[in-house]
Amino acid sequence: MDYKYIIKKIDQIIDQKPKVCLILGSGLNDFCNQLKNQKKINYSDINCFKKNKIEGHSKEFVFGYINKIPILVANGRLHYYEGYTFEEVGVLIKVFNYYKPSKYIITNSTGTVNKDWSIGDFMITQKFLDFSFIKNNKHRYYYLKNQINIKNKKLHYGTYTYTIGPTYETKTEIEEIKFLGGDVVGMSTFPEYMMCNYLKINPIILSCITNYAAGIESTPVKHSHVINNAKKSKLNFIKLLTEIVLLQNNT
């Protein structure tokens, strides 16, 4: 995937280099409504991207301002399960890195295995648990530099567990993930983090908890529930993400 071509297309809609670059996860696209003087380009207008359409992902780049801070948003991410390689999923980070922003933010919608946490809560990732078994048959941990310290009763700090998807985990898998120390489970973000790691970037990773993982509750997990619960959390999510955007530069 030619990231330089993607940059060339983005340069057609921006009037200055972004100081904040961020990726929005499933159902979290309402944050873009906060941006002033918006300019957009659809992924479909950039020939590098597949034509896949996943509910909750708008698949567009949006440029705009919050408090005069220029922000570039990837409104909708790529996934390994769509047929992209890890490196291709990480292309959004390579694009962001070209602009050398002061802050990289990656967001996602996740399920939690922690019964003490509630749907509508949020989590900052401090550690990854790779539960994909793509490269070998063992799980592995990756530790992040903790960049922010926001006090919010709905905000937690913990471990993001990466699984391949697109199917949700079994009850047995969730029990093992909990035993291994996972707090939330998702099908994204880890490939982008690996590109950040390669480029020596310290991202802020924010999860919106949209459901309990399989087996925690009696009702089955559905993507439609994830989207609906993300929408219900949108006001708190927008408030928290805006607070993170406006924090002093810390990368």
Language-model segments: residues:
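Metabolite-binding pocket within alpha/beta catalytic cores that recognizes anionic/polar moieties
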Residues: M1-H139
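Polyanion-binding loop/helix "lid" in catalytic or ligand-binding cores
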Residues: Y141-I150, I164, K171-I174, A230-T242
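His/Asp/Glu-rich mid-to-C-terminal helical/loop segments that flank catalytic regions of hydrolases
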Residues: A214-T251
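Non-catalytic positions within long, well-ordered alpha-helices that form the structural scaffold/packing
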Residues: F96-K100, K178, N197
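Active-site/ligand-binding-proximal alpha/beta "capping" segment
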Residues: I148-G186
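Zn-dependent metallopeptidase/amidohydrolase metal-coordination segment
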Residues: M187-H225
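Generic hydrophobic/aromatic pocket-lining and core-packing "Φ" positions
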Residues: I93, I174, F190-Y193
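Short acidic/polar active-site loop segments enriched in Thr and Asp
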Residues: S102-K103, D183, N202
